[in-house]
Amino acid sequence: MARILITGSTDGFGLEAARQLVDRKHVVYLHARSQERAEEVKTKCPGAAGVLVADLTSVAETRKLAEEANAIGTFDAIILNAGLLYGPFRKTDYGVPAMPFVNVLAPYILSCLLEQPKRLIFIASILHKEAKTDLKDIFWLERGEKEFQDFPAYCDSKFHVMLLANAVAKRFKGTSVTSVHPGYVATKLGGSGATDKMEDGVETYVMLAEGDYDQSLTGVYFVPKKQIGEPLPETTQEDLQETVVKACEDITGIKLPA
């Protein structure tokens, strides 16, 4: 029996993975961005051990989530599942748009502040292969709202979070750090035109959460059906990884543990 935290678990992959892990007798904590969403998900996954509430576009609330999770105890597995795909620029703390905040900065803050788990799973996307790899203006502070386009920004953010995951993997000894492309399915993010099966992605979540794989693997990219995928080669470049880490540290003032 494992203790598991899944961020962004009120719908989609996060919710379905939580349901299956609860059915498999694990102690699962959910996360919702608001109290209203928390009350709703309690009825969708009644076997969950609890629901933590935090808006991951806020540094203060992301810190609070880490503090409340740490108060529960060390987790066996943490799935950093929360993410944004579509939407307006919407400035958040430090002037960062909501999308790169939720997709990159929030996972960075949580990686820094949460007690180190046995397994840490970042949610990537095959769309990281469509990203710009020059890492200029990661958080849109120079380009601003006039140049913002949500789909390219999403692709870039998933490239950035994979670089972050690989940087964390090098630092967190004793933790299997992985990233996963869940698949293109008809969730809130995927939309109605999606072609993959949710179950194929969820079974990968469940495998990684339970540790039903070689946990000496770290810095590895998984895809649906429990398979290891081929990421963009640039995701393995240490200079790019450290550029993302430094950008996150410069914005937040929070240092990633060595």
UniProtKB/Swiss-Prot annotation:
Keywords assigned by UniProt, alphabetized: NADP, Oxidoreductase
Signal peptide: none
Name of this chain's protein: Short-chain dehydrogenase chyC
Binding site for NADP(+): R37, D55, N81, Y154, K158, V185, T187
Gene: chyC
Effect of loss of the gene: Accumulates 2-(2-aminopropanamido)benzoic acid, 2-(2-(2-carboxyacetamido)propanamido)benzoic acid and 2-(2-((4-amino-1-carboxy-4-oxobutyl)amino)propanamido)benzoic acid, but downstream compounds are still produced in low amount.
Family under the similarity heading: Belongs to the short-chain dehydrogenases/reductases (SDR) family.
Pfam families: adh_short
